[in-house]
Each structure stands twice: as structure tokens, then as C-alpha cells.
Amino acid sequence: VHLHGDEKAAVLALWDKVDEEKVGGEALGRLLVVYPWTQRFFDSFGDLSTAAAVMGNPKVKAHGKKVLHSFGEGVHHLDDLKVTFAQLSELHCDKLHVDPENFRLLGNVLVVVLAQQFGKAFTPELQAAYQKVVAGVASALAHKYH
């Protein structure tokens, strides 16, 4: 990911304030509600029949935290995302057969949740930097597919 020094500093500063459990659960939950076809990868999560069921589902929240923790690893290794996400890319491609477009969708949902969580502190400039980051992470996760 090509960020200027001030962009990288701003991304890292905001990330240090992110509650991985709260933001991760919200982001994954929204992905499953807004793009319901993504639910097919989460059959073992139980009731995903309504938005309220998805957003209140403890397995969604727990997996969302796990996803956001991995995303945070990427935030701290922006210069080496392909290596950082190599194993996850292989898992999602070879074993789980996840459509790589879902990584882009989740990244965009994450940006929405960050904007919601941080309000005015999530400036247009910071959003632009995070859009670069989520695009880079999505590309790294899709790398095994190429």
C-alpha cells in the first residue's frame, strides 16, 4: 500500500483506538446483512435469519474480532501485505473457496463502521487513506487466486 508518511501515521494512530471486538463484530455483521449471500460461509453460526439475529449473534461477534485482529496485523505491516496475508489467502482460496470480491466488500463495510465509530475524527483524508489500506488488504487476500 502506497501511503504518504502523514497518511500512514494517521492510519496507525486511529487503529490504536479501534476496539477490535466492537468494530469487528459490527463490520462482519453488516457484511452478512447487507450482502446476505456471504452468509453461506457461516452455516455453523446458527441463526442469521434477520438483521437483529445477525448483529446479536455471539459467533458473528467473535469471528468479527478475529477478522479485525488479522486486519490490524496488516495495518502494522503495510509494506508487506502479501506476506502478512499469505496463509489466510491460501485458506480462503483453497479450503474455504471464498469469492475474493467478498474481501473488497468487507473492506468497504469496515470503512463505513470506522466512520460511524469515529465520527468527525474520521476525516475525508483519513477515509481516503483507509480506502487504500482496505484495497491493499483485499488484494493481498485475493493474491492466491491469481
UniProtKB/Swiss-Prot annotation:
What keywords would UniProt list here?
Acetylation, Heme, Iron, Metal-binding, Methylation, Oxygen transport, Phosphoprotein, Transport
Protein family (similarity comment): Belongs to the globin family.
> What are the binding positions for heme b in this chain?
63, 92
Q: Which GO terms describe its molecular function?
A: haptoglobin binding; heme binding; hemoglobin alpha binding; metal ion binding; organic acid binding; oxygen binding; oxygen carrier activity; peroxidase activity
Database matches in CDD domains = Hb-beta-like
Give the sites modified to N-acetylvaline.
Answer: 1
What are the annotated GO cellular component locations? Answer: blood microparticle; haptoglobin-hemoglobin complex; hemoglobin complex
Known function: Involved in oxygen transport from the lung to the various peripheral tissues.
Tissues with expression: Red blood cells.
Q: Which sequence positions carry the modification called Asymmetric dimethylarginine?
A: 104
Q: Which residues are recorded as modified (Phosphoserine)?
A: 44
Assembly and oligomerization: Heterotetramer of two alpha chains and two beta chains.
Q: Which SUPFAM superfamilies match?
A: Globin-like (SSF46458)
The name on file for this protein is Hemoglobin subunit beta-2
Entries under Gene3D superfamilies matching the protein: Globins
Any keyword Metal-binding? yes
- Which residues are modified to Phosphothreonine? 123
List residues, modification N6-succinyllysine: 17, 59
A biological process (GO) of this protein is: hydrogen peroxide catabolic process
**InterPro entries named among the record's database cross-references:** Globin (IPR000971), Globin-like_sf (IPR009050), Globin/Proto (IPR012292), Hemoglobin_b (IPR002337), Hemoglobin_oxygen_transport (IPR050056)
Residues of the Globin domain: 2-146
Give the species: Tapirus terrestris (Lowland tapir)
* Source lineage: Eukaryota, Metazoa, Chordata, Craniata, Vertebrata
